[in-house]
């Protein structure tokens, strides 16, 4: 019998839950602040009268304005798609830390480029800067969840990867409110719209500085044959000595997982590509990871993020500032609910139940909002006042946000950071992040045209996709809460899917008890001089 993985409820020293692990996760999550801010500020910036006047939107036909706006928004997602794959070789050869530094540097360059745009130079610098910024956030969206999941103890892995999602929402909150602030306090001018673009430099600058002081992922160091440095980093992160039994168990599990990979996939740069192309189990899991992001974007959330003025106008709100204020409230709701998700839900309710409940609740709300728009046709309400039905529709819109945010907003990122064995994780996360940006690109590119052509049908479209996601999650997605990264193969191979979590955890508890019994029988004693090796218990 050999060492298997760690289980969520094994005896865990209190030292493991320390400030260092949260600080590392928080610094890495400045990546998501960049993403959140960029996703939120651009839609309301394009709606500012000063921006539209300087770039002559006011002289264009509505269809042309929709097309240019969609291009400005979507070139960022196009860059992010390629950035997600660009991060794979950096993360593989140079590590997670250098990957984060590279992402921050590229994003900062792109954000700086955008500041050179004006009416005389045209939109070229904004297009180019947003492509570069997209490459940076695409790379960051690949590396950050991997980095955090590789540092985290199983029992708080969802918690820590959730810090990434929290950073996204904090960045989004600032992005949603900043244009309301400049529109209320500054006269229409170049300065009014350039300030939101300049604020992009704050999270990227903080990441650029903070990443210098990050500790490299111990799991990446083990896979790169830098064992002593890996043990040193792991001991620093866990605040435990190398000869502590908790450390011996964890390092033994990592050693065993790497040995299994050597004998199956292999540890080289191209090995995961070969495995992805020839191993049906890996292909299937890549498909599931991509589908999680398909259904996430199928919720309609990014249509709201990027085109909130258009969305609120369809419900009946009038006035640029009113739409921006409502967008800001949307950001507040998302951020508050994300705190609840992070602190109470993700590692208590688990991933699977959150997805199921969130999809059901969000779908009902979207059906109601769509039905109101179909019946009342608020877009033709010329007096600009909200009716009782409109207020109810706004309530269900915000209720949709309450259902969506703690379920589909961050959970796909958490699950994709968990689903793959260590040597597949970089490539798998690259594919997952790229798929997110691909679906994101399609939504951002065609949302204006969808609202123009489909009207209330857009709400029914997204509501229908949410219903379909319930079936997919129930039959295909297992619960990953508390399952060690090294045991994901066993989880996905266990049937039926809806019982796999309990079956695998029971087996892990049994193996953990046997391992500790073998340790005691081997005469292990805690000694600072004992050389740390992968422990091999006696055969049963």
Curated annotation (Swiss-Prot):
Gene3D superfamilies reported for this sequence: MFS general substrate transporter like domains
Transmembrane segments: 23-43, 75-95, 98-118, 131-151, 158-178, 194-214, 286-306, 326-346, 353-373, 388-408, 457-477
KW DNA damage (keyword) present: no
Subunit and partners: Interacts with creB.
Record flagged with keyword Repeat: no
GO MF annotation list: carbohydrate:proton symporter activity
InterPro entries cross-referenced by the UniProt entry: MFS_dom, MFS_sugar_transport-like, MFS_Sugar_Transporters, MFS_trans_sf, Sugar/inositol_transpt, Sugar_transporter_CS
Matches recorded under SUPFAM superfamilies: MFS general substrate transporter
Functional note: Integral membrane transporter that imports quinic acid to be catabolized as a carbon source.
Pfam families: Sugar_tr (PF00083)
Predominant place of localization: membrane
Keywords for this protein: Cell membrane, Membrane, Quinate metabolism, Transmembrane, Transmembrane helix, Transport, Ubl conjugation
Highest rank taxon of the organism: Eukaryota
GO biological process, one term: quinate metabolic process
Gene Ontology cellular component terms for the protein in this record: plasma membrane
Family: Belongs to the major facilitator superfamily. Sugar transporter (TC 2.A.1.1) family.
Biased composition (Basic and acidic residues): 528-540
Positions in the Extracellular compartment: 44-74, 119-130, 179-193, 307-325, 374-387, 478-540
Subcellular localization, as worded in the UniProt entry: Cell membrane
Residue intervals on the Cytoplasmic side: 1-22, 96-97, 152-157, 215-285, 347-352, 409-456
Protein name according to UniProt: Probable quinate permease
Post-translational modification remark: Ubiquitinated. Deubiquitinated by creB, probably to control its activity or amount.
Membrane topology annotation: Multi-pass membrane protein
């Amino acid at each position: 019998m050999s060492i298997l993985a760690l289980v969520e409820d094994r005896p865990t020293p209190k030292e493991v839950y320390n400030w260092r692990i949260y600080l590392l996760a928080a610094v890495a999550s400045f990546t998501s602040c960049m993403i959140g801010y960029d996703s939120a500020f651009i839609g309301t910036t394009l709606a500012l009268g000063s921006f539209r006047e300087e770039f002559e939107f006011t002289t264009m036909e509505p269809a042309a304005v929709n097309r240019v706006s969609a291009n400005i928004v979507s070139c960022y997602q196009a860059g992010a798609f390629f950035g997600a794959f660009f991060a794979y070789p950096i993360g593989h050869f140079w590590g997670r830390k250098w990957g984060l530094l590279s992402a921050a540097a590229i994003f900062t360059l792109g954000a700086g480029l955008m500041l050179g745009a004006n009416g005389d130079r045209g939109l070229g610098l904004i297009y180019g800067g947003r492509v570069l910024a997209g490459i940076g956030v695409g790379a960051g969206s690949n590396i950050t969840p991997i980095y955090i999941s590789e540092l985290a103890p199983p029992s708080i892995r969802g918690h820590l990867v959730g810090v990434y999602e929290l950073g996204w929402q904090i960045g989004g909150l600032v992005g949603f409110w900043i244009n309301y602030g400049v529109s209320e306090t500054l006269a229409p001018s170049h300065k009014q719209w350039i300030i939101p673009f300049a604020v992009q430099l704050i999270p990227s600058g903080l990441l650029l500085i903070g990443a210098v002081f990050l500790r490299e992922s111990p799991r990446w160091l083990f896979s790169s044959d830098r064992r002593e440095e890996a043990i040193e980093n792991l001991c620093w992160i866990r605040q435990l000595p190398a000869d502590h039994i908790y450390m011996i168990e964890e390092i033994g599990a990592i050693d065993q997982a790497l040995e299994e990979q050597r004998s199956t996939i292999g540890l080289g740069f191209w090995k995961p590509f070969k495995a992805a192309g020839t191993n049906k189990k890996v292909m299937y899991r890549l498909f599931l990871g991509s589908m999680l992001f398909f259904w996430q974007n199928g919720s309609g959330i990014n249509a709201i993020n990027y085109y909130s003025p258009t969305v609120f106008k369809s419900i009946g709100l009038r006035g640029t500032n009113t739409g921006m204020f409502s967008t800001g409230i949307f950001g507040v709701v998302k951020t508050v609910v994300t705190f609840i998700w992070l602190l109470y839900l993700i590692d208590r309710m688990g991933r699977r139940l959150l997805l199921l409940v969130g999809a059901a609740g969000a779908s009902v709300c979207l059906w109601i909002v769509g039905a109101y728009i179909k019946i009342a046709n608020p877009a033709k309400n010329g007096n600009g006042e909200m009716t009782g039905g409109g207020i109810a529709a706004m309530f269900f819109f915000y209720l949709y946000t309450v259902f969506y945010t703690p379920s589909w907003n961050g959970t796909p990122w958490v699950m994709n950071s968990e689903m793959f064995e260590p040597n597949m994780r970089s490539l798998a996360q690259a594919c997952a992040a790229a798929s997110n940006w691909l679906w994101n690109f399609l939504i951002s590119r065609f949302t204006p045209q969808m609202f123009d052509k489909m009207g209330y049908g857009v709400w029914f479209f997204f509501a229908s996709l949410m219903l379909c996601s319930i079936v997919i999650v129930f039959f295909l997605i297992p619960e990953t809460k508390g399952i060690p990264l090294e045991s994901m193969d066993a989880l996905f191979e266990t049937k039926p899917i809806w019982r796999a979590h309990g079956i695998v955890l029971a087996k892990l508890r049994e193996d953990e008890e046997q391992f500790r019994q073998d340790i005691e029988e081997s005469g292990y004693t805690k000694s600072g001089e004992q050389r740390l090796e992968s422990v091999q218990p006696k055969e049963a």
